[in-house]
Amino acid sequence: MNTIVGTYECKVDSKGRLMMPNPLKKQLNVSLQEGFVLKRSVFQQCLELYPMKEWDLMMQKINKLNRFVKKNNDFIRRFTAGVRIIEIDATGRLLIPKDLAVFASVTKDIVLSSAVNIIEIWDKDLYEKAIDDSVGDFADLAEEVMGNVNDDEYGIS
């Protein structure tokens, strides 16, 4: 798994295209040839851009679900609803399909935010609200999520 780093502000043109920032393109160099998968986020009103290798890993996990369990089928259907294969063109632009742009309220000003191994694509105002709303709770969240992690191999304890 490659870790993606950075938060970048961009603009979307009238056709729904955005220019991938150069620092992000450099990090995704290998993925540029393989393509990406773009989908709705499960928890937020944003989009998730998966490098194809990361998407394949996610699909390996999902393929382990028993398809004879109704809620597994419901999850798979909803998780993959609206999923699109996306390529970055020769000029470095990425086209956001209209239905996904509507879901995430992507119109003009957007934020590309790294989320470990994927990129979240946010409407700028919604991103700032999501970050601002969680500032007070972040210390508690960090303690709850990471406080019990004891992994000296990576320096987390």
UniProtKB/Swiss-Prot annotation:
Record localization: Cytoplasm, Nucleoid
One of the protein's GO biological processes: negative regulation of DNA-templated transcription initiation
Ranges for domain SpoVT-AbrB: 7-54, 83-126
Keyword Repeat: yes
Keywords: Cytoplasm, DNA-binding, Repeat, Transcription, Transcription regulation
Source organism superkingdom: Bacteria
Single GO MF annotation: DNA-binding transcription factor activity
Keyword presence, Repeat: yes
Cellular-component GO terms for this entry: cytoplasm; nucleoid
Family statement drawn from the similarity comment of this UniProt entry: Belongs to the MraZ family.
PANTHER family in the cross-refs: TRANSCRIPTIONAL REGULATOR MRAZ
Self-association state and partner proteins as the record states: Forms oligomers.
NCBIfam families: division/cell wall cluster transcriptional repressor MraZ
Protein's name in the database: Transcriptional regulator MraZ
Organism: Flavobacterium psychrophilum (strain ATCC 49511 / DSM 21280 / CIP 103535 / JIP02/86)
